[in-house]
């Protein structure tokens, strides 16, 4: 039996394909680090077909994601872990947080010892002491009464990219000779904190090496931008950073109450438990006022021996505050010192338009473009919801598609719902208000990562 010319050519092609075939182990590695842009072979109804890997991701999300969910109608401060339980143990997104020194151009000079930063030069001569985080993906979703927060290292469908960011490791001070906002450990007169009280330098209430206060948000923004002229790369604390740090904590500890007692032990499943403790929130208001007029007293970098870790360190107040040697616990979250308590913190990238009258609205506008940050209008900002009109413990937040953490409804308690307090007041005429987070050293259980005031 003879083959036709066409049949012979087909046989030759089959033999050539077989001869040139490669084992899987012989194939080159893919380029790039996004596997979800790839095509793969699938079998459908007995026929081989190609498919984009991304089309199959809904089935893979549970393996690539970890996060939390809560029923907003339930008063418990505890939330439910969802996704890959192994990721709740390994915390890959969280473990990207690490201390570093950053130069004025935004370049990392060096990464700090993850166990203890005290061996590094942190006085500003080699850069600002910052915590690097980001370079992951997140999703905020709502289904009826259920709110979910999801993190992943991969670009799953519907997830948003969180770029690499840097946040001050300490409450900021100001380099007085240059008016530059600074994150340093430096007790010289050039980095005198507070309101720059030189006559306190030799007293127990010294503000050398302490955070700077009594500065408007406008000036905080200006001092931050002074670090690199003509650039908006440097800023004071921004709402986007504040928001993401809050959700990182909630997902890690599965609680809405950041002031849960600090606990070094893992759960039986291997998860984090507890919170960050009271923090610097337990002073007596009158005694603090008498001691130093509500100015800061915790030195920047006081907890640096904890490195990139989370924990708390005891600080003894001077006898001029209280003869009984009052003690407070300075908390740290993954390298960030005093994430709440001690002193209030201005936040940029959020403006609230508060209308007068009992039927008015307090409209929340946010912005992720630092070039549009301002204190006079809402140009370039997006309306994301309305702030609660009354003071009280937070029961509901705006949440939405971007995980907004601004209170939408009060009626909670110090151990229920969000466990943090919301301050506001209604003006006689329309007013633009900024937002303060964190609380002061005497606010006790009303403090926390979600504690905020509109001023």
Where are these regions (language model features)?
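GGW-centered surface loops in extracellular recognition modules
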Residues: 30, 60-132, 138-140, 234
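Short aromatic-cysteine micro-motif
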Residues: 120, 124-127, 151-339
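Cytochrome P450 core scaffold surrounding the K-helix E-X-X-R motif
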Residues: 142-143, 177-178, 350-361
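C-terminal, surface-exposed recognition/capping segments
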Residues: 239-243, 265-300, 323, 339-352, ...
């Amino acid at each position: 039996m003879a083959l036709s010319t066409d049949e012979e050519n087909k046989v030759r092609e089959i033999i050539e394909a077989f001869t040139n075939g490669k084992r899987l182990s012989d194939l080159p590695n893919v380029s790039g680090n996004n596997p979800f842009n790839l095509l793969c072979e699938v079998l459908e109804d007995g026929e081989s077909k190609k498919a984009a890997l991304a089309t199959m991701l809904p089935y893979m999300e549970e393996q690539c994601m970890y996060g939390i969910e809560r029923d907003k109608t339930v008063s418990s401060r505890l939330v439910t872990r969802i996704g890959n339980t192994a990721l709740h143990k390994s915390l890959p997104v969280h473990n990207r947080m690490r201390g570093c020194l950053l130069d004025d151009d935004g370049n990392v000079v060096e990464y700090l010892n993850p166990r203890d930063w005290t061996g590094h030069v942190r006085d500003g001569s080699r850069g600002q002491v910052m915590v690097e985080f980001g370079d992951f993906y997140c999703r905020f979703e709502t289904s009826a009464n259920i709110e979910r927060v999801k993190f992943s290292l991969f670009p799953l469908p519907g997830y948003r990219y969180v770029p690499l960011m840097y946040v001050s490791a300490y409450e900021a001070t100001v380099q007085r000779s240059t008016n530059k906002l600074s994150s340093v450990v430096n007790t010289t007169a050039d980095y005198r904190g507070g309101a720059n009280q030189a006559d306190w330098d030799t007293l127990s209430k010294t503000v050398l090496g302490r955070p700077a206060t009594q500065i408007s948000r406008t000036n905080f923004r200006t001092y931050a931008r002074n670090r690199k002229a003509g650039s908006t790369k440097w800023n004071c604390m921004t709402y986007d950073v504040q928001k993401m740090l809050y959700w990182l904590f909630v997902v890690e500890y599965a609680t809405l109450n950041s002031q849960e007692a600090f606990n070094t032990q893992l759960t039986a499943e291997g998860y984090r438990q507890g919170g960050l403790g009271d923090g610097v929130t337990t002073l007596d208001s009158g005694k603090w006022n008498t001691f130093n007029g509500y100015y800061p007293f915790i030195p920047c970098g006081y907890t640096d021996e904890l490195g990139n870790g989370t924990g708390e360190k005891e600080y003894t107040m001077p006898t001029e505050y209280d003869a009984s040697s009052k003690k407070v616990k300075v908390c740290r979250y993954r390298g960030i010192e005093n994430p709440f308590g001690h002193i209030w913190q201005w936040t940029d990238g959020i403006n609230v338009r508060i209308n007068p009258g009992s039927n008015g609205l307090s409209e929340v506008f946010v912005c992720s473009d630092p070039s549009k940050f301002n204190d006079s209008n809402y140009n370039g900002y997006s309306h994301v919801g309305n702030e609660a009109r009354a003071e009280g413990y937070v029961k509901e937040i705006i949440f939405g598609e971007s995980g907004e953490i601004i209170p939408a409804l009060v009626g909670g308690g110090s151990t229920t719902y969000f466990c943090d307090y919301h301050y506001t007041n209604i003006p006689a005429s329309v007013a633009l208000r900024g937002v303060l987070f964190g609380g002061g050293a005497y606010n006790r259980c009303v403090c926390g990562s979600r504690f905020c005031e509109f001023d």
